[in-house]
């Protein structure tokens, strides 16, 4: 058997194995949807390359490229991981692994990682990265061919050496080069305070494990001081622990569905509010924006769909899936999304169509460009975007108005 034949057999078998795994997980390998026909086209293309390409192709590069393209075109939150990537993925922790302190996504239509949110006090926030920034390259290496695990991997190493990022910001024609230290990010604290009219304000920057217990303690203290209403600020709250999201929503619900999880081959798992975990029945308004993603979206949807309170702001990002790591014989692995989170009303938080993803607020309040803090315009670090002054914060002001006078909800919807 010549080397080209060996190459063809290896590549076909590798892709078939991966295709079978992904198809089996997602329930997509069937004659009805034309999957096998697409495989035959792939094999025809492979045959043409084998017979007509000017040089003998690199087996490793071809196999890796074919598998990577297959996985990431099917699943933007998945990826083909090398053995080195697998070790990093299993040990990764946002607050224990060196990095830049940013929550990232890789929208399939964009092809590059984008910043959803930055952790207050983290190196990305201090360096001026903002939600919506596109990371075009890291240390001169393009990120277009990287999955998110690989992006975080290169952002964590080498430790102590700043990462040189080429960033594309909105409304700017040319990329900016930003140097960001690689360092351990500290978990941000919950912020609570008493606003006017006895309204408790609770800001949750990140839903890490244990944060719900912290919210319970601090909010309970405000309730005992006379708070009669609650503003739960989940703007720029991305990522986090899904279990914490369920627990946080349960603080405001004594019954009903909080969310459910389901996939093609993943049995439906429903999360229901427990009356014993209820903290308060006080009126609540939840603040959200385009950087509200993941666990925070579960909370907002639970409050909204159970008619427990108003959700104020703009449509959220739309991220809510569960990944499974599938080991392969050579130490590499597939990271595949196997289930998605659904709202109590049955809507996918992370829809196939990005336009349908996310949670729409009951009261939409858009922020004007002038109300968005730009690091170049003022000596204000990006974390200040989370909490503009009360005079500037139209979303917070409207939430307060609604809590003080619920009759203003309909007027607000018309105005928005």
Please state what every model-predicted region is:
Residues 22-38, 44-54, 58-59, 114-118, ...:
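Cleft-lining beta-strand/loop regions that shape enzyme active-site pockets
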Residues 80, 258-259, 271, 317, ...:
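Short clusters of hydrophobic/aromatic residues that line enzyme substrate/ligand-binding pockets
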Residues 333, 340-416:
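Conserved functional hotspot residues or short segments at active or partner-binding sites
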Residues 2-79, 111-113, 389, 394-398, ...:
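Terminal targeting/pro-maturation regions of precursor/exported proteins
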Residues 278-286, 331-340:
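A polyampholytic, Gly/Pro-enriched intrinsically disordered region
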Residues 53-116, 160-179, 186-192, 400, ...:
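Extended, small/polar residue-biased N-terminal targeting/export presequences
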């Amino acid at each position: 058997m010549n080397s080209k034949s060996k190459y063809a057999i290896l590549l076909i078998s590798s892709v078939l194995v991966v295709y079978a795994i992904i198809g089996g997980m997602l329930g997509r390998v069937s004659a009805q949807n034309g999957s096998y026909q697409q495989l035959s086209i792939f094999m025809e293309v492979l045959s043409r390359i084998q017979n007509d390409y000017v040089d003998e192709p690199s087996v490793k590069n071809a196999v890796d490229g074919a598998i990577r393209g297959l996985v990431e075109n099917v699943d933007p939150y998945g990826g083909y991981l090398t053995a080195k990537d697998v070790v990093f993925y299993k040990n990764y922790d946002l607050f224990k692994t060196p990095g830049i302190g940013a929550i990232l996504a890789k929208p399939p239509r964009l092809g590059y990682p984008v910043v959803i949110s930055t952790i207050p006090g983290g190196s990305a926030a201090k360096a001026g990265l903002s939600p919506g920034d596109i990371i075009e390259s890291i240390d001169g290496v393009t990120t277009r061919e990287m999955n998110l695990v690989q992006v975080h991997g290169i952002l964590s190493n080498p430790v102590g050496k700043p990462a040189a990022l080429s960033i594309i910001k909105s409304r700017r024609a040319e990329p900016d080069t930003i140097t960001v230290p690689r360092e351990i990010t500290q978990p941000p604290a919950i912020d609570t305070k008493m606003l006017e009219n006895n309204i408790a304000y609770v800001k949750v920057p990140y839903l890490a494990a244990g944060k719900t217990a912290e919210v319970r303690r601090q909010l309970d203290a405000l309730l005992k001081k006379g708070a009669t209403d609650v503003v739960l600020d989940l703007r720029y709250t991305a990522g986090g622990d899904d279990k914490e999201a369920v627990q946080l929503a349960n603080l405001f619900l004594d019954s009903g569905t909080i969310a459910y999880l389901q996939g093609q081959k993943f049995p439906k798992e429903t999360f229901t509010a427990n009356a014993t975990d209820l903290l308060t029945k006080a009126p609540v308004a939840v603040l959200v924006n385009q950087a509200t993603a993941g666990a925070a979206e579960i909370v907002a949807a639970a409050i909204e769909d159970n008619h427990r309170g108003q959700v104020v702001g703009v449509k959220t990002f739309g991220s809510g899936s569960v990944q499974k790591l599938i080991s392969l014989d050579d130490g590499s692995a597939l990271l595949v999304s196997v289930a998605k989170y659904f709202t109590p009303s049955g809507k996918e938080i992370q829809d196939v169509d990005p336009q349908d993803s996310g949670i729409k607020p009951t009261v939409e309040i858009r922020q004007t460009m002038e109300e968005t803090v730009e690091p170049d315009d003022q000596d204000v670090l990006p974390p200040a975007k989370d909490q503009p002054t009360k005079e500037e914060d139209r979303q917070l002001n409207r939430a307060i108005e609604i809590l003080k006078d619920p009759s203003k909800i309909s007027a607000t919807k018309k105005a928005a």
